[in-house]
Swiss-Prot record:
Record: disease: Defects in IQUB may be the cause of spermatogenic failure with radial spoke defects, leading to asthenospermia and male infertility. Sperm appear largely normal morphologically but with radial spoke defects, and their motility is severely reduced.
Subunit structure and binding partners: Component of the axonemal radial spoke 1 (RS1) complex, at least composed of spoke head proteins RSPH1, RSPH3, RSPH9 and the cilia-specific component RSPH4A or sperm-specific component RSPH6A, spoke stalk proteins RSPH14, DNAJB13, DYDC1, ROPN1L and NME5, and the anchor protein IQUB. Does not appear to be part of radial spoke complexes 2 or 3 (RS2 or RS3). Interacts with CALM1. Interacts with DNAJB13. Interacts with DYNLL2. Interacts with NME5. Interacts with RSPH3. Interacts with RSPH9. Interacts with ZMYND10.
InterPro entries: IQUB, Ubiquitin-like_dom, Ubiquitin-like_domsf
Start and end residues of each stretch annotated as Disordered: 1-73
Pfam families in the record: ubiquitin
Domain IQ: 338-367
Origin species: Homo sapiens
Source species taxonomy: Eukaryota, Metazoa, Chordata, Craniata, Vertebrata
Cell compartments where the protein resides: Cytoplasm, Cytoskeleton, Flagellum axoneme; Cell projection, Cilium
Name used for this protein in its record: IQ motif and ubiquitin-like domain-containing protein
Reported function: Adapter protein that anchors the radial spoke 1 (RS1) complex to the A microtubule of outer doublet microtubules in axonemes. The triple radial spokes (RS1, RS2 and RS3) are required to modulate beating of the sperm flagellum. May play a role in inhibiting signaling via MAPK1/ERK2 and MAPK3/ERK1. Additionally, may play a role in the functioning of cilia. Not required for the functioning of tracheal or ependymal cilia.
GO annotation terms (biological process): cilium assembly; flagellated sperm motility; mating; smoothened signaling pathway
Residues annotated as transmembrane: none
Keywords attached to this entry: Cell projection, Cilium, Cilium biogenesis/degradation, Cytoplasm, Cytoskeleton, Disease variant, Flagellum
Length: 791
């Protein structure tokens, strides 16, 4: 054999050795912090390897280095080795076939013997350290059987199941024999020996957030185990056996038997498992449905025996007793005694039942009285809260309704004073008292005007912030499963940047350096566009910086800073600089879109949008705007519509909860509900004549029909709740009362005759749906999602 052939054979031997190393390494569980086991075994046989030439040794060392480097896989590869360690087992016959294919040589045969001895020792040491572990997943009860080394820490087993279950390893716990195993412990520390079968449980410490579920794809997967088979007198061989979990029996399709060896060979069958035939239900048959009764008397047998004294037989009489007959009583006496006992039982039962009945009545009465007391307390509490709210609105007016309420109180006070003056004074004294009354009224009106100005400034700042929040809000979509999707566009991001700059400008208590930084940021932002507005803003910024450098006090710069903020807000409201704001401006950029929505106010002589006019359902033309109507009310009548607004809002909420596409109720305006309450129902309940508007509600007369002015009734809240529980109006009310209600409905239908025609034009109008959705009570459950921490 030539030297080249020897080198070639040695290289093939080393390569095959490396492959066998890799195959056998899948049986062991290499730990990253420890050295591979093959190194110790290899060092013991260095003397055998040194028999080769120097070139052969260098080549073998290079290959062994590569094999050692392959022993450092990641965690996933490590756990794959733990799960199926015996799928790639070492078979000496396979290597013997490979070695037999090569040309025999004395040196190569010696080297092969050394390699075989090393691998057999490694295989025995690894196989001896393995134990069969049955892992049970709690609470699903899934069982997974895997081989695992008894001297390997349990951290690798926990990491593997953490990867399969998608649960952090810190949440998983391993339990063996009722004890919780730690990560740095091994099975040997708990008395588990090699080749044993143990059962451990894996569960989650936080089942609500990280539940343990079944691992798909493992129940039907076959398992491979190694079985030791005796092949000779003192010879044993390990054979891999695959366990297939299937209850399907292969059908016998014929075959033949070898005459010499006696081995049976079956014909091939299909691997498709046939469909399971469903079990048929038990069917019972009977001849007829007629039941036959049979009455037979039968006397049961009773075996008895007697023992008499006799010669040779002794019977003890120590336990005998003398029985004497009692007093005889007839059947009538017996039945009379039973009847007397029954009467006694009935007497005591009826007494007990009467006590229970009276106790139930007493308890129901106490509950009823307690409920009535709570209702009275609730009404008193609501009245007190209404008075407190009234007092708070008088002293801290903020909305238009509050000032409307103040003017109403002023008019009520003026009427009382006027009546008192007319009754108490005459002539010159009356004129002097009227002049004094007029002066007081003027002072009160001036005070109300000052409060209105303060509230207007506060509301204006809040309106500006709400406007900026609306412009910078992201786009929101609601998915069918209840979740929301938010998306920011380049326009919303631009609007948010301008909003942040505006907030920084409006800050009060900041240092001079911080103010200079804000002005510098504003200057760079405004410089992007050149126009008259931006030029004026830049001049004001330079002026403020110059004054600050000269040491001007802050309170002297308030006017200049307010002017800068006002101009910058106009800058934000310009669609050229902030495109997102174009959707929320009252005056659109395209005049044609605004052409058909402008109306002329005959009072203030202004052209205003349609939203500035209050239109009743019975109106025939548009005459005056809202501001003119409110101004006329404050100057002349000074009426308060707050209670009517509450009544109308309660009607909106009630009709929105019906969800029957009612539209007439949402067409009713404040003037309509006022006319309906005052002129049709006389501002009082039909049943109890209660005239407290804060306690009255307007509900449907017939709850199966849509609400309308000719299908409503004015009742208190308690009466309305009882009215809506009626199943039939004819059974709940008298005929005279029903006739009275229908007469009022006819009056309302004549006055609101245009409402049905108006409702027919807005069947497909989306504004009604928006109003209904605004007052609809949201009862859908909130979905809270738990976000898992990253692995």
């Amino acid at each position: 054999m030539s030297n080249q052939q020897e080198k070639y054979e040695a290289q093939n031997i080393v390569n095959s050795t490396e492959e066998s190393d890799d195959a056998f390494d899948t049986v062991t569980i290499p730990v990253p912090s420890e050295e591979p086991q093959e190194s110790d075994q290899t060092e013991e046989h260095e003397s055998g390897i040194e028999q080769f030439s120097e070139s052969h040794a260098i080549h073998v060392e290079e290959q062994s280095d590569q094999s050692f480097s392959s022993l450092e896989p990641d965690n996933e590869q490590l756990m794959e080795e733990v799960i199926s360690p015996r799928q790639v087992s070492y078979t000496p016959q396979h290597h013997e076939k490979q070695y037999a294919m090569q040309r025999p040589n004395d040196d190569s045969l010696a080297f092969l013997d050394k390699i075989k001895s090393v691998k057999e020792s490694l295989q025995e040491s690894v196989e001896d350290s393995l134990a069969t572990v049955k892992v049970v997943l709690i609470p699903v009860g899934q069982e997974i059987v895997i081989p695992f080394k008894v001297d390997t820490i349990l951290k690798y087993l926990k990491d593997h199941f953490s990867h399969l279950l998608g649960i952090p390893h810190s949440v998983l716990q391993i339990r063996y024999s009722g004890k919780i195993l730690k990560n740095n412990e091994t099975l040997v520390q708990h008395g588990v020996k090699p080749q044993e079968i143990v059962q451990v449980e894996i569960f989650s410490t936080n089942p609500d957030l990280y539940p343990v579920r079944r691992i798909d794809g493992l129940t039907d997967v076959s398992q491979i185990i190694t079985v030791t088979v005796q092949t000779g007198l003192d010879q044993y061989q390990q054979v891999p056996v695959e366990i297939v979990k299937s209850d399907f029996h292969k059908p016998f399709l014929g075959g033949f038997r070898h005459k010499v060896t006696g081995v049976e060979y079956h014909n091939a069958g299909t691997q498709t498992v046939p469909k399971r035939i469903p079990e048929r239900l038990s069917i019972f048959c009977r001849d007829t449905q007629t039941v036959f009764q049979k009455k037979n008397l039968q006397q049961t047998t009773n075996t008895t025996s007697t023992q008499m004294t006799n010669i040779g037989v002794y019977v003890s009489n120590m336990t005998d007793k003398l029985v004497t007959p009692g007093k005889y009583f007839s059947a009538a006496e017996y039945h009379a005694q039973r009847l007397k006992a029954v009467i006694v039982i009935q007497t005591y039962y009826r007494q007990w039942h009467a006590k229970i009945f009276v106790e139930n009545l007493r308890r129901q009465k106490s509950l009823r009285l307690e409920w009535e007391t709570q209702q009275e307390l609730r009404k008193i509490r609501e009245k007190e809260e209404w008075i407190k709210l009234d007092y708070h609105r008088r002293h801290n007016p903020k909305t238009n309704e509050d000032f409307e309420f103040l003017y109403n109180a002023l008019e009520f006070w003026r009427q009382e004073e006027l009546t008192r003056i007319n009754q108490s004074f005459t002539g010159a004294e009356r004129k002097a008292a009227l002049c004094e009354l007029l002066e007081k009224e003027t002072q009160i009106i001036a005070s109300i005007g000052r409060h209105r100005y303060i509230a207007y400034m506060a509301n204006q700042e809040a309106a500006i912030q709400a406007f900026l929040d609306k412009c910078s809000a992201p786009k929101i979509w609601r998915t069918p499963n209840g979740k929301t999707i938010e998306m920011d566009t380049q326009f919303t991001i631009r609007a948010r940047e301008l909003q942040n700059i505006y907030k920084c400008i409006m800050l009060k208590n900041i240092s001079q350096d911080e103010r200079l930084d804000v002005l510098l940021t504003l200057k760079h932002t405004v410089k992007e566009h050149e126009c008259k507005l931006t030029q004026e803003i830049l001049e004001l910024i330079d002026r403020e910086v110059d004054l600050m450098m000269r040491g001007v006090k802050h309170h002297n710069l308030e006017g200049l800073r307010k002017r800068i903020a006002t101009l910058f807000f106009h800058y934000i409201k310009t669609p050229l600089f902030n495109p997102e704001v174009a959707k929320y401006l009252k005056v659109p950029q395209d005049p044609l879109k605004f052409y058909k929505k402008i109306y002329f106010c005959h009072s203030c002589q202004l052209y205003l949008p349609s939203t500035e006019f209050s239109v009743s359902s019975t109106s025939r033309r548009i005459y005056r705007c809202r501001n003119c109507i409110n101004l006329q009310n404050e100057a002349q009548k000074r009426e308060s519509f707050l209670k009517y607004k509450c009544l109308l809002q309660q009607l909106y909420y009630t009709e929105a909860d019906y969800e029957d596409d009612s539209k007439i109720a949402f067409l009713m305006q404040l003037q309509d509900i006022q006319y309906l309450t005052e002129n049709i129902w006389a501002s009082q309940s039909v049943l109890s004549a209660c005239d407290n508007l804060s306690d009255l509600v307007m509900v449907r007369w017939n709850k199966s029909l849509e609400w309308s002015p000719w299908n409503c009734i004015l009742l208190t809240k308690d009466e309305a709740a009882a009215h809506l529980k009626l199943t039939s109006i004819e059974e709940g009310y008298e005929r005279s009362f029903i006739h009275k209600i229908k007469h009022k409905h006819i009056l309302a239908k004549n006055y609101f005759s245009q409402v049905p025609v108006l409702a027919s034009f807005i069947l497909d109008d989306g504004e009604i749906d928006e109003i209904r959705w605004k007052y609809h009570s949201d009862t859908t459950p909130k979905i809270i999602e738990s976000q898992r921490p990253p692995h």
